[in-house]
Amino acid sequence: MRNIYLALNQHICGALEAAFPQASLVAKQSGQSLNPQLVPATKPEFGDFQVNGALALSKILKKAPRKIAEEIIKQLVKNDDFNKLCLKPEIAGPGFINLTIQNSCLTTEICARLNDDHLGVPIAKPLKTHKSLKPIVVDFSSPNIAKEMHVGHLRSTIIGDSIARVLEFRGHPVLRLNHVGDWGTQFGMLITYLKLVAPEALTTANAINLGDLVKFYRQAKKLFDEDETFQDASREEVVRLQNGDPQSLKAWQLLCDQSRIEFEKIYKRLDIHITERGESFYNQYLQDVIDDLKSTNLLVTDNGAKCIFLDDITGKDGKPLPLIVQKTDGGFNYATTDLAAIRYRLQAYPQGDGACRLIYVTDAGQASHFFAVFQVARRANWIPNDCRIEHVPFGLVQGEDGKKLKTRSGDTVRLKDLLDEAIIRAKNDLEERLNAEGRKEDQEFINKVSRVIGIAAVKYADLSQNRITNYQFSFNRMLALQGNTAPYLLYALVRIAGINRKGGSLNATINKLTFNEPQEWMLARELLKFDEVILQVEEELLPNRLCNYLFELSQVFNRFYDQVPVLKANDSLKASRLALCQLTADTIKLGLKLLGIPTLDRM
């Protein structure tokens, strides 16, 4: 109801100004305004919206809150445009104003949504100071080369993808960046080891697979920790790599390519589109970071290392802790690379990306790192006043025992294995259901539905949780046909598709709707919340808000369909009820698309 909200807010602000002209003038002179605090109603009995500002305004206006509410209403009811929009306002409690939208306005909005691919969600507009929208960077997924993607990467990948989808839907240009770990001392160690045990992997494409590469990496790490001679050789290899030695660079590129092949298989299964821009991309800018920090007098040399001390970050003794950006041996670290990335991403195009908002989707364990890096970037004046930079943290994936999800042998769960298991279980559930119903379906149907349900269940189970908290992974819960799950929502869509098939297609344009049952109005009101939910997700970066809305919408629809005849209704009511069915399907389908979840016509 964004359009209705904006119109209401304008009317109420006008009423406040008319009721209290002197106070409004004083507020304007100080660059402020009297805030009516218009918000969506918390319960249906409070109407559609509530004006909660009377309590706060009582301190400014030196009047009782109810008296303020009465004065606001007195001005509102003089306004014909307001009366067309709203029923007569009611005062509740100490001075809250409850507002209920006219039925005619609700049906007009529903008609508009039926003919709008965006379902009422407004397209983002640039700031007054900009001619066009500036890019938003969403940094997510970010696996490490020579390591397999595990369950921890699932959260970053699908949360980041969903955030990017919502921002793109709003019309923002989005840079989906995969900050892969493709540089560092581990490559010197791995290349040195492969020269000993599998030299062909350093000269020939696809000589080994990622699984072998992971094993070699573990063996190389063990040898590195135990053998000083191997350590020295590894460090020499790192120097050759950093100096651009052709053979070392070729070996490094082959290792990256091999890992990339496996990453792409996962991304394809999850329908993830992302641009790789790894740590190595920023190597050329690392010295610029040091020079910049030096010119702003932020750098301090401490025990031979170059670092920045931040007052906001202290040790147990209360003293400031340093953020090291150049080690004693002259090498750089993750902090330097992340600072270079921030600097590049915010620099105006073509020197950089020219972004206006940076969003980093990583586990909560990196919160202190990003807090420090962001502080340095601000103190270096790299972040313009009209830009936002945010860390989007998420919790752990736990087993049903409440501990970090592991395999039986204690290893980290590979993402590939987890997705395979989800599809197998979805297939078993589907075949059991088909047998119980006596339905015959071909193998192509069974395989397709199993893939969609399996992947959808895994993604939705994660996205439906508040990302900030840990969550317990359970195949049984996520594949259930009841509760806040992907199968429940997919089944709701299939059910509506069946209704629409039986009821026939709607007219191309519907200009008038007739509702006479409480369940119809309840469904209409729920459908009109979609635009506000999307705007909320864009601001808060919490995809679970959208999941909760879709689940609530599907429940409201089921109550409507169970209690109100649709296909058996007379023609004047049938078209309106089919329109509600169609808009519900469109809303759920679009919502799931923004979550990165595929849908089905049949299950």
Curated annotation (Swiss-Prot):
GO cellular component terms attached to this protein's record: cytoplasm
One of the record's GO molecular function terms: arginine-tRNA ligase activity
Primary enzyme class: ligase
Enzyme Commission identifier(s): 6.1.1.19
Domain of life: Bacteria
Reaction it catalyzes: tRNA(Arg) + L-arginine + ATP = L-arginyl-tRNA(Arg) + AMP + diphosphate
Principal location class: cytoplasm
SMART domains: Arg_tRNA_synt_N, DALR_1
Classification via Pfam families: Arg_tRNA_synt_N (PF03485), DALR_1 (PF05746), tRNA-synt_1d (PF00750)
SUPFAM superfamilies in the cross-refs: Anticodon-binding domain of a subclass of class I aminoacyl-tRNA synthetases, Arginyl-tRNA synthetase (ArgRS), N-terminal 'additional' domain, Nucleotidylyl transferase
Renumbered ranges of motif 'HIGH' region: 143-153
InterPro entries linked: aa-tRNA-synth_I_CS (IPR001412), Arg-tRNA-ligase (IPR001278), Arg-tRNA-synth_N (IPR005148), Arg-tRNA-synth_N_sf (IPR036695), ArgRS_core (IPR035684), DALR_anticod-bd (IPR008909), Rossmann-like_a/b/a_fold (IPR014729), tRNAsynth_Ia_anticodon-bd (IPR009080)
Compartment list: Cytoplasm
GO BP annotations listed: arginyl-tRNA aminoacylation
Keywords: Aminoacyl-tRNA synthetase, ATP-binding, Cytoplasm, Ligase, Nucleotide-binding, Protein biosynthesis
Family: Belongs to the class-I aminoacyl-tRNA synthetase family.
NCBIfam families, alphabetized: argS
Oligomeric form and interacting partners: Monomer.
Protein name listed in UniProt: Arginine--tRNA ligase
Organism whose genome encodes this protein: Prochlorococcus marinus (strain MIT 9211)
